[in-house]
């Protein structure tokens, strides 16, 4: 009887020891899983290097046009370049700058996000997302933009509709007096289950001074994704080169997401 008791006790101790080892291994595995960088969970869908194909159909103050383009981007570095060409409606009788943000700020999946901010945009693929933007200029000019962004293999596909109206004939847009968009910051926050972005933006003018414009964008993922907390996206958009009439243009953007740089005391 004593031998049987010792045997049973030994077996019980061994079972408890093995169970503890198993639980520790499971905990270690769970901890390692939680530490996997966010980028690795989306990299199977979105590659480190992505191609871009786009088409914009638009109308500004009654002038219709079509622009097509291709490019390349690094979604996890926050940079991309586009080569664009006016296919219909050339030469454009207005400043090209008002179009550029619909191409570059148009795909936030090409923004560099840190691991501690949920990347609403990359999560949305392969289904993709759409967005709508209103641009209100200081001289009462208005732009409405809609874009649908999808994915085919290693390429982002943009279908863009751009409508501008009420630009004064003697204003900086119709007189082509703008030089570039200044660097800016988009405020990102959740409202009614979608992501909203606000920007107070400025165009540098020939001879000095600035031309103000307020952006409001609504981003809608095509599937349920994790929503981010209130954050910011810093971005700079530049025209690298262009021909005389801006029929062919190369654009570049750098964009990085972040929380506030100021520490909280609350």
UniProtKB/Swiss-Prot annotation:
Q: How is it used?
A: Fluorescent proteins have become a useful and ubiquitous tool for making chimeric proteins, where they function as a fluorescent protein tag. Typically they tolerate N- and C-terminal fusion to a broad variety of proteins. They have been expressed in most known cell types and are used as a noninvasive fluorescent marker in living cells and organisms. They enable a wide range of applications where they have functioned as a cell lineage tracer, reporter of gene expression, or as a measure of protein-protein interactions.
Please cite one Gene Ontology biological process associated with this protein: generation of precursor metabolites and energy
How is the protein altered post-translationally, as described in the entry? Contains a chromophore consisting of modified amino acid residues. The chromophore is formed by autocatalytic backbone condensation between Xaa-N and Gly-(N+2), oxidation of Tyr-(N+1) to didehydrotyrosine, and formation of a double bond to the alpha-amino nitrogen of residue Xaa-N. Maturation of the chromophore requires nothing other than molecular oxygen. The precise stereochemistry of the tyrosine has not been determined.
Q: Where is this cross-link: 2-iminomethyl-5-imidazolinone (Gln-Gly)?
A: 104-106
Query: Among its keywords, does the record have Cell division?
Result: no
Q: List residues modified as 2,3-didehydrotyrosine.
A: 105
Could you tell me which InterPro entries the record lists for this protein?
Answer: GFP, GFP-related, Green_fluorescent_prot
Q: In which tissues is it expressed?
A: Tentacle and oral disk.
List the Pfam families hit by this protein, alphabetically.
Answer: GFP
Which UniProt keywords are present, listed alphabetically? Answer: Chromophore, Luminescence, Photoprotein
Decide whether keyword Cytoplasm is in the record. no
Function of the molecule: Pigment protein that is green in color.
Q: Which family does it belong to?
A: Belongs to the GFP family.
Name it: GFP-like fluorescent chromoprotein cFP484
